[in-house]
Amino acid sequence: MRFFKAISLIFSATLMSGIAQANQLTILHINDHHSHLRADGRMSLNIGGENTRVRSGGFPAIVSTFNKLSAGKSNVLKLHAGDAITGDLYYTLFKGEADAALMNEVCFDAFALGNHEFDDGDAGLVNFLDFLNKGGCQTPILAANVVPKAGLSPLTKNSATDYIQPFTVVNKGGMLIGIIGIDIANKTKNSSSPDETTLFLDETETAQKYIDELTSKGINHIILLTHYQYENDLRLAQKLRGVGIIIGGDSHTLLGDFAGLGLNSSGPYPTVVENADGQAVCVAQAWQYSQIVGE
Protein backbone atom coordinates (compact mmCIF):
# COMPACT_ATOMS: atom_id res chain seq x y z
CA MET A 1 0.00 0.00 0.00
CA ARG A 2 1.32 3.45 -0.84
CA PHE A 3 0.54 6.61 1.10
CA PHE A 4 0.87 9.70 -1.04
CA LYS A 5 -1.48 12.40 0.11
CA ALA A 6 -2.14 15.55 -1.90
CA ILE A 7 -3.23 18.44 0.32
CA SER A 8 -6.11 20.07 -1.53
CA LEU A 9 -6.93 23.73 -1.65
CA ILE A 10 -7.29 26.07 -4.59
CA PHE A 11 -5.95 29.59 -4.13
CA SER A 12 -8.81 31.45 -5.74
CA ALA A 13 -10.00 35.01 -6.17
CA THR A 14 -10.74 35.52 -2.50
CA LEU A 15 -7.08 34.95 -1.67
CA MET A 16 -5.42 37.09 -4.32
CA SER A 17 -6.80 40.61 -4.64
CA GLY A 18 -7.88 41.59 -8.11
CA ILE A 19 -8.00 38.10 -9.62
CA ALA A 20 -11.42 37.33 -11.03
CA GLN A 21 -13.09 34.05 -10.18
CA ALA A 22 -12.99 33.10 -13.86
CA ASN A 23 -9.20 33.30 -13.71
CA GLN A 24 -8.70 30.86 -10.88
CA LEU A 25 -5.10 29.95 -10.12
CA THR A 26 -3.92 26.57 -8.88
CA ILE A 27 -0.61 26.50 -7.03
CA LEU A 28 1.15 23.15 -6.70
CA HIS A 29 4.22 23.06 -4.50
CA ILE A 30 6.82 21.00 -2.67
CA ASN A 31 9.82 21.74 -0.49
CA ASP A 32 12.71 20.00 1.25
CA HIS A 33 12.81 16.83 -0.80
CA HIS A 34 16.52 16.52 0.10
CA SER A 35 17.42 14.05 -2.67
CA HIS A 36 14.84 11.55 -1.37
CA LEU A 37 13.97 10.19 -4.79
CA ARG A 38 12.83 6.66 -3.94
CA ALA A 39 9.64 5.76 -2.11
CA ASP A 40 10.05 5.15 1.62
CA GLY A 41 8.77 1.91 3.13
CA ARG A 42 9.39 2.84 6.75
CA MET A 43 6.41 5.10 7.49
CA SER A 44 3.78 3.93 9.97
CA LEU A 45 0.23 5.27 9.77
CA ASN A 46 -2.98 4.66 11.68
CA ILE A 47 -5.19 2.91 9.14
CA GLY A 48 -8.52 1.52 10.30
CA GLY A 49 -7.37 1.85 13.89
CA GLU A 50 -4.26 -0.24 13.30
CA ASN A 51 -0.64 0.88 13.15
CA THR A 52 0.31 0.01 9.57
CA ARG A 53 3.64 0.29 7.78
CA VAL A 54 3.19 1.81 4.33
CA ARG A 55 5.27 2.62 1.26
CA SER A 56 5.09 6.36 0.71
CA GLY A 57 6.32 9.17 -1.48
CA GLY A 58 9.21 9.13 -3.93
CA PHE A 59 9.87 11.66 -6.67
CA PRO A 60 8.22 9.60 -9.43
CA ALA A 61 5.04 9.88 -7.34
CA ILE A 62 5.66 13.63 -7.08
CA VAL A 63 5.81 13.84 -10.88
CA SER A 64 2.64 11.80 -11.39
CA THR A 65 0.78 13.79 -8.72
CA PHE A 66 1.75 17.09 -10.33
CA ASN A 67 0.52 15.74 -13.66
CA LYS A 68 -2.73 14.50 -12.15
CA LEU A 69 -3.47 17.74 -10.30
CA SER A 70 -2.59 19.82 -13.39
CA ALA A 71 -4.80 17.86 -15.78
CA GLY A 72 -7.58 19.93 -17.31
CA LYS A 73 -6.46 23.16 -15.63
CA SER A 74 -5.18 26.09 -17.63
CA ASN A 75 -3.64 28.26 -14.90
CA VAL A 76 -1.26 26.12 -12.85
CA LEU A 77 1.82 27.37 -11.01
CA LYS A 78 4.44 24.78 -10.00
CA LEU A 79 6.80 25.84 -7.21
CA HIS A 80 9.69 24.33 -5.24
CA ALA A 81 10.64 26.09 -1.97
CA GLY A 82 14.21 24.85 -1.65
CA ASP A 83 16.49 22.21 -0.16
CA ALA A 84 16.20 19.99 -3.19
CA ILE A 85 19.60 18.45 -2.57
CA THR A 86 21.68 16.70 0.12
CA GLY A 87 20.29 14.25 2.64
CA ASP A 88 20.34 10.97 0.73
CA LEU A 89 22.81 8.77 -1.15
CA TYR A 90 21.38 10.01 -4.44
CA TYR A 91 23.13 13.30 -3.78
CA THR A 92 26.30 11.66 -2.48
CA LEU A 93 26.57 9.61 -5.66
CA PHE A 94 25.25 12.02 -8.30
CA LYS A 95 25.76 15.52 -6.82
CA GLY A 96 22.35 16.76 -7.89
CA GLU A 97 22.20 15.30 -11.39
CA ALA A 98 19.48 12.80 -10.45
CA ASP A 99 17.50 15.48 -8.59
CA ALA A 100 17.74 17.85 -11.54
CA ALA A 101 16.55 15.21 -14.01
CA LEU A 102 13.44 14.46 -11.96
CA MET A 103 12.75 18.11 -11.17
CA ASN A 104 12.74 18.78 -14.90
CA GLU A 105 10.02 16.15 -15.28
CA VAL A 106 7.81 18.46 -13.19
CA CYS A 107 9.13 21.59 -14.93
CA PHE A 108 8.79 24.04 -12.05
CA ASP A 109 7.85 27.65 -12.72
CA ALA A 110 10.26 28.72 -9.96
CA PHE A 111 12.73 27.20 -7.52
CA ALA A 112 13.86 29.07 -4.40
CA LEU A 113 17.31 28.35 -3.00
CA GLY A 114 17.51 26.79 0.45
CA ASN A 115 20.41 26.63 2.88
CA HIS A 116 21.43 23.12 1.81
CA GLU A 117 21.88 24.24 -1.78
CA PHE A 118 25.09 25.84 -0.44
CA ASP A 119 26.45 22.77 1.38
CA ASP A 120 29.18 22.32 -1.24
CA GLY A 121 29.84 26.03 -1.61
CA ASP A 122 28.95 28.30 -4.50
CA ALA A 123 30.80 25.96 -6.88
CA GLY A 124 28.74 22.97 -5.78
CA LEU A 125 25.56 24.97 -6.32
CA VAL A 126 26.70 25.91 -9.82
CA ASN A 127 27.25 22.23 -10.56
CA PHE A 128 23.67 21.40 -9.52
CA LEU A 129 22.16 24.36 -11.36
CA ASP A 130 24.04 23.43 -14.53
CA PHE A 131 22.40 20.00 -14.33
CA LEU A 132 19.02 21.68 -13.82
CA ASN A 133 19.56 24.02 -16.77
CA LYS A 134 20.36 21.12 -19.12
CA GLY A 135 16.66 20.32 -19.31
CA GLY A 136 14.18 22.15 -21.47
CA CYS A 137 12.42 23.85 -18.55
CA GLN A 138 14.95 26.58 -17.69
CA THR A 139 13.38 26.99 -14.26
CA PRO A 140 14.06 30.43 -12.73
CA ILE A 141 16.30 30.16 -9.65
CA LEU A 142 15.19 32.67 -7.02
CA ALA A 143 16.93 34.16 -3.98
CA ALA A 144 16.41 37.90 -3.69
CA ASN A 145 18.47 38.21 -0.52
CA VAL A 146 21.45 36.20 -1.77
CA VAL A 147 24.11 38.32 -3.50
CA PRO A 148 27.16 36.45 -4.85
CA LYS A 149 30.25 38.58 -5.35
CA ALA A 150 30.65 39.45 -9.01
CA GLY A 151 33.96 38.23 -10.38
CA LEU A 152 34.67 36.00 -7.37
CA SER A 153 31.77 33.60 -6.93
CA PRO A 154 31.34 30.85 -9.55
CA LEU A 155 27.69 31.96 -9.57
CA THR A 156 28.78 35.17 -11.35
CA LYS A 157 30.50 34.24 -14.59
CA ASN A 158 29.39 37.50 -16.18
CA SER A 159 27.11 39.19 -13.64
CA ALA A 160 25.53 38.69 -10.20
CA THR A 161 22.36 37.38 -11.85
CA ASP A 162 23.88 34.74 -14.13
CA TYR A 163 22.33 31.95 -12.07
CA ILE A 164 20.20 33.59 -9.36
CA GLN A 165 17.35 36.06 -9.87
CA PRO A 166 15.55 38.06 -7.16
CA PHE A 167 12.16 37.38 -8.74
CA THR A 168 10.37 36.16 -11.80
CA VAL A 169 7.10 37.27 -13.37
CA VAL A 170 4.79 34.70 -14.92
CA ASN A 171 1.66 35.16 -16.99
CA LYS A 172 -1.14 32.75 -16.17
CA GLY A 173 -4.34 33.38 -18.11
CA GLY A 174 -3.55 37.06 -18.43
CA MET A 175 -2.62 37.38 -14.75
CA LEU A 176 0.85 38.78 -14.15
CA ILE A 177 2.18 37.15 -10.98
CA GLY A 178 5.41 38.18 -9.31
CA ILE A 179 7.29 35.44 -7.45
CA ILE A 180 10.07 36.56 -5.09
CA GLY A 181 12.58 34.12 -3.60
CA ILE A 182 13.84 34.44 -0.01
CA ASP A 183 16.46 32.21 1.66
CA ILE A 184 17.03 31.90 5.42
CA ALA A 185 20.08 34.12 5.81
CA ASN A 186 21.72 33.41 9.16
CA LYS A 187 21.15 29.66 9.00
CA THR A 188 22.68 29.46 5.53
CA LYS A 189 25.72 31.47 6.57
CA ASN A 190 26.28 29.59 9.82
CA SER A 191 25.32 26.00 9.03
CA SER A 192 26.07 25.66 5.33
CA SER A 193 29.14 26.50 3.24
CA PRO A 194 28.51 29.46 0.94
CA ASP A 195 31.56 31.37 -0.27
CA GLU A 196 32.69 33.96 2.26
CA THR A 197 32.12 36.75 -0.25
CA THR A 198 28.49 35.79 -0.90
CA LEU A 199 26.14 38.12 1.00
CA PHE A 200 22.87 37.18 2.68
CA LEU A 201 20.59 40.17 3.23
CA ASP A 202 17.76 40.75 5.69
CA GLU A 203 14.72 38.72 4.68
CA THR A 204 12.00 41.25 5.56
CA GLU A 205 13.70 44.32 4.09
CA THR A 206 14.58 42.47 0.90
CA ALA A 207 11.10 41.05 0.44
CA GLN A 208 9.46 44.47 0.85
CA LYS A 209 11.98 46.05 -1.53
CA TYR A 210 11.05 43.71 -4.36
CA ILE A 211 7.33 43.73 -3.58
CA ASP A 212 7.47 47.51 -3.95
CA GLU A 213 9.46 47.23 -7.18
CA LEU A 214 6.94 44.83 -8.69
CA THR A 215 3.86 46.77 -7.59
CA SER A 216 5.38 49.97 -9.00
CA LYS A 217 5.34 48.18 -12.36
CA GLY A 218 1.66 47.28 -11.99
CA ILE A 219 2.24 43.69 -10.87
CA ASN A 220 -0.10 43.35 -7.89
CA HIS A 221 -0.31 39.58 -7.45
CA ILE A 222 2.72 38.73 -5.32
CA ILE A 223 3.88 35.34 -4.06
CA LEU A 224 6.86 34.90 -1.78
CA LEU A 225 8.64 31.60 -2.37
CA THR A 226 10.62 31.23 0.82
CA HIS A 227 13.01 28.87 2.52
CA TYR A 228 12.53 30.57 5.87
CA GLN A 229 10.57 28.24 8.21
CA TYR A 230 6.84 28.23 8.94
CA GLU A 231 6.84 30.40 12.08
CA ASN A 232 9.15 32.92 10.41
CA ASP A 233 6.82 33.02 7.39
CA LEU A 234 3.85 33.82 9.64
CA ARG A 235 5.73 36.73 11.21
CA LEU A 236 7.05 37.86 7.83
CA ALA A 237 3.56 37.95 6.35
CA GLN A 238 2.33 40.26 9.10
CA LYS A 239 5.19 42.73 8.56
CA LEU A 240 4.86 43.10 4.80
CA ARG A 241 2.61 45.17 2.56
CA GLY A 242 1.39 43.87 -0.77
CA VAL A 243 1.95 40.13 -0.37
CA GLY A 244 -0.90 37.65 -0.86
CA ILE A 245 0.66 34.20 -0.60
CA ILE A 246 3.77 32.70 0.98
CA ILE A 247 4.86 29.23 -0.12
CA GLY A 248 7.59 28.12 2.24
CA GLY A 249 10.08 25.50 3.32
CA ASP A 250 12.97 24.68 5.67
CA SER A 251 10.99 23.70 8.79
CA HIS A 252 9.58 20.54 7.14
CA THR A 253 6.13 21.56 8.37
CA LEU A 254 3.05 19.39 7.84
CA LEU A 255 -0.13 21.47 7.59
CA GLY A 256 -3.71 20.25 7.34
CA ASP A 257 -5.75 17.63 9.17
CA PHE A 258 -4.05 14.23 9.14
CA ALA A 259 -5.12 13.17 12.63
CA GLY A 260 -7.03 10.24 11.15
CA LEU A 261 -3.71 8.84 9.96
CA GLY A 262 -1.97 9.46 13.26
CA LEU A 263 0.12 12.36 11.94
CA ASN A 264 0.53 15.59 13.88
CA SER A 265 0.05 18.86 12.03
CA SER A 266 1.44 22.28 12.93
CA GLY A 267 -1.60 24.20 11.71
CA PRO A 268 -4.30 24.54 9.06
CA TYR A 269 -3.54 24.38 5.34
CA PRO A 270 -3.20 27.13 4.40
CA THR A 271 -2.64 29.17 7.53
CA VAL A 272 -4.22 32.59 7.01
CA VAL A 273 -2.87 35.75 8.66
CA GLU A 274 -3.20 39.47 7.92
CA ASN A 275 -0.45 41.45 6.25
CA ALA A 276 0.46 45.03 7.16
CA ASP A 277 -2.33 46.25 4.85
CA GLY A 278 -4.91 44.21 6.77
CA GLN A 279 -5.33 41.83 3.83
CA ALA A 280 -5.37 38.03 4.09
CA VAL A 281 -2.15 36.16 3.38
CA CYS A 282 -2.15 32.41 2.83
CA VAL A 283 0.94 30.69 4.24
CA ALA A 284 1.57 27.11 3.10
CA GLN A 285 4.25 24.44 3.30
CA ALA A 286 4.29 20.81 2.12
CA TRP A 287 6.16 18.72 4.70
CA GLN A 288 9.29 16.90 3.46
CA TYR A 289 11.14 14.16 1.57
CA SER A 290 8.90 13.82 -1.52
CA GLN A 291 5.93 12.82 0.66
CA ILE A 292 3.33 15.48 -0.12
CA VAL A 293 2.28 17.84 -2.89
CA GLY A 294 0.56 21.00 -1.71
CA GLU A 295 -2.32 22.30 -3.81
Protein language model annotation of sequence segments:
Residues 2-21:
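Gram-negative bacterial Sec-dependent N-terminal signal peptides
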Residues 22-295:
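Acidic, metal/ion-coordinating pockets
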